[in-house]
Structures are given as structure tokens and as C-alpha cells.
Amino acid sequence: MGTCTGHADLVELKDGRWYMVFLGIRNDEEGTSNMGRETHLVPVAWEPSTVRWEEVSKGNWQPVEYLWPVASPETGKVERYTSLPFPENPQYFNDAFTDNFDAEELGHEWNFRRVPLPGTYSLSAFKGFLRLHLKPETFKLLGRYSLMGIRQKESDFDYSAKMHFEPNKENEEAGISIFQQDDNYVNFTVVKKGKGVNLKLTVKEREKELEVLKEEIIDKYQGEIIFKLSAKNNTYQYLYSLDGGNTFRLFAETQSNIVLCKGYIGTYVGIYATSNGKPTKEYADFDWVSYKGYPRY
């Protein structure tokens, strides 16, 4: 199930067994996956192979054999799961993450695209919340903007975020994002439009123009919303709740390959805020984010 494999290291255990650790991409969708290049493990067997023939005496030719490492000798391919070398140590799948923003500093799970702009976020302005300040900057090549995320770890997952946001000026916008590159992302956001507030789904596919896939007024919006992105069977569902998570409404649906990795870099899910080119002092407060991955078997 692995593609783009390479950069292998061979390891011999104390009992004489051999394994190979290398980079590769899961073959989850269209020969690739949204997680990019990851670390894989396979068993190795050493098998003899004739590399040349030598004439040891006149007319007497003998094969010269070397031992070569054969990766995954039983099946000849990278399997989705390989038993760990040490059966007494069960494999731990770290496929869940929740941040209630109660700590004084962000955990190491969080990443930014490049060094964040000064004053991008605060964990102290509103205790128990992450305050993400709206910046005029938006997604652009080699740009810096109010965007932060955690790694997507499985092709099937649920990602949710609870946001408090009361925009005052036209086009002030905040919400969640799933992003692969500066030119390949999906934003699911609340945005100020006229006297009302809209819910908007924006899609930027690679080598295509930016598209507002859906936008509509939220009649009962009271400044609080829970976004949910549910990924199952190569499909993304974009849902939201206005009643604290008691009920969710399906807003839109897309195929997951709109942010499909075509290189070695994986996808992030995260939060995003922008004033779309206008200076502002507004912000969005995030109460929590939650991610749960579901391994494929």
C-alpha cells in the first residue's frame, strides 16, 4: 500500500532479525494520501543473488553471490500494518487530539505556515480560549496570515472547533480550514455580509481559481458556532451546530481529493481568521478544537 518509498535505514536487532525503516505514502486515494510522506516499517530477509560470474580457472566459471536485503519478503509489498518487532510492546495509535486552551502555551501539535505575524494569537486575553486575531492577510503564496493547524493523521477523521465570533465590519471572517498548500485549501467560515452574518465554504483546488462553493445567511446565529468536518470514504462533509452541539446541520459536501497531496507534504486541519485586506482590531475566540482519526483496516 506504500508509494514513493525511499531513504531506507536497515536495523539489525539483538536476536538477528532485520527491519527496514523508510519513507512512503499510503495508497489511500488515487495512489497517494493527504498525509504525505510518512515513516514505514517492514521486515527484511537477506537473500543470495548472483551479481557476476568469475573464471576461477581456465574454462571454469563460478557465480559470485552477494546477500541482498529483501523488504517485506512474505508479500513483496508494503502492508498497511506490520507487527512491531517487540510483541510485549503493543503499538500505540495517537489518533486523537483535543485542546481546551487551558495551558499557558500552545502544545507542540500546533503548527503555523511560516513564522506567525506579531499578535496573531493569545492564550491569556480570554482565559480558557485561544484568541485568534483577524489580520488583513489571506491565503497567498509564501504569505503569513492568521492560520494555525495540526497534522491530519488518517484519511478518515472528525475535526471540530467551537468558536465565539461577532464580526462588525464587512468581510470580517473566521472559522476552520483544511489546508495542503498556499494554493490548495478549503475554508469553512462565518463572514460578515451587510447587516447579517453568512456561513461560507471556500475551495481552492490546485491550478484552479478560488471558488465560493456555498454561502448563505445564518438566521439564528448568536455569536457562537461549532464547526465539524467529517471525512469518510473519500468524502468531506461540512456540518455546523448553533445549539452547543446538540444537533448538527449538513452545510455542504465535497470529495476529499480537492486537497489531495501530490507531493511529500501532508495536510493540516486548523483555524483561520482574516479581515480580507482591511485593518481591524477584531478577533475570534476558540473554546476548543477536537480531532479523532479512524485507521483504515
PLM regions and their residue ranges:
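Carbohydrate-active catalytic/glycan-binding domains of CAZyme proteins
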Residues: M1-Y297
